Amino acid sequence: MVKPVRVLELITVPADFNGLTRFPMRLIAKMDPSAVRADLLTYAVGDERIRGEIETMGAKLYVAPHRLKHPLSYMRFVASLVRENRYDIVHLHGNSCTLAIDLWAAKRGGARVRIAHSHNTACKFTLLHRLLRPAFNALYTHAYACGDEAGRWLFGRKPFRIIPNAVDAEALAFSEPARADVRAEFGLKDEPVLGHVGNFVPAKNPLFLMEVLNRLPECRLLLAGDGPMRAEVEARAAEMGLSGRVIFAGARGDMPRLYSAMDALLLPSLFEGFPTVALESQCAGLPTILSEAVTRDCALTDFAAFEPLDAERWAARIREGLGQNRAQQSAEGRSAVVQAGHDLTHLAANLQAEYLRLVQADRPQK
């Protein structure tokens, strides 16, 4: 009997209902466990509910010491885990050359296939990013990216393979019953609901949402996510007299239901790789407004639009998009996402085949 390929999906953020965690989770769930057996590793758990989801998939979640606060302990932990579990592949998900820390540990543990996967177009640790680039370039064996811009950011002129972000399109179909249930949960009536999905961090630019809401007195704002800026956003809402119109829903595991309750999705990011949220919102038929910092590749429908960070322009664009036929737009969005190659089942099958090919290859090549 052929043993399954052992894969460690290493994420460089706390395990939570964020895109970087959900990306490998969704793919693992679609793979054949007799062919690929995968686990996840992080340095912190932001929401314990995610642990249950991972274990339900038949995978394990390992929590290492903090990778930047305690790098030596972290590297020893990762190397030991890779060695003990005999992982064939370590697939690292991040956005900077600080991945050199993780790559060194994976190599030390004996992993011959070490995939660096770029999920963004910028990072917080710019000095470390520059200093660690030579080590990073020497340590990865394969380069993946969520899109062209993210690939060029992390790998420069070196070759990389684009692994597109993907979603379960049919699971995101607009649902009138779900819309009614979620609106009842939050005490919403007929008022338009603007939505944002993401962590409360500077890159997501959550304070800009208050400026937009302030120009749309007829609207409510539903924020799904959590993070270090939440208290600051709550304070800004109170300062502007908007607290009664903003719903802080926290991290949620039922996003398809929440999308159905919304009337527009806003992504005013300052930098972004390829936002899975934009794919999800279009599958749900939501008018989707994105900052010009977001890659154009994620706009697959005519109800996704880009605007400069001018609150007046965003407010005008939102008013233009309200009142459309959601069921029809949802059907159009799901079709566009699948046709563009962002279907989760298809991507999981391709990545499973790639994992098997990499392990069978005599020697990994860059």
Regions found by a protein language model. Name each.
Residues N18-R26, P192, H196-R215, P228-E234:
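A conserved mid-protein helix/loop that constitutes part of the nucleotide-sugar donor-binding site
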Residues R108, I115-A145, R152-F155:
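A conserved, positively charged/aromatic
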Residues E149, A166:
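Carbohydrate-associated surface elements
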Residues A173-G187:
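A short helix/loop element that forms part of the nucleotide-sugar donor recognition site in Leloir-type
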Residues A251, L270:
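Aromatic "clamp/platform" in nucleotide-sugar-dependent glycosyltransferases that forms part
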Residues R326-P364:
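A charged, aromatic-enriched C-terminal amphipathic alpha-helix characteristic of glycosyltransferases
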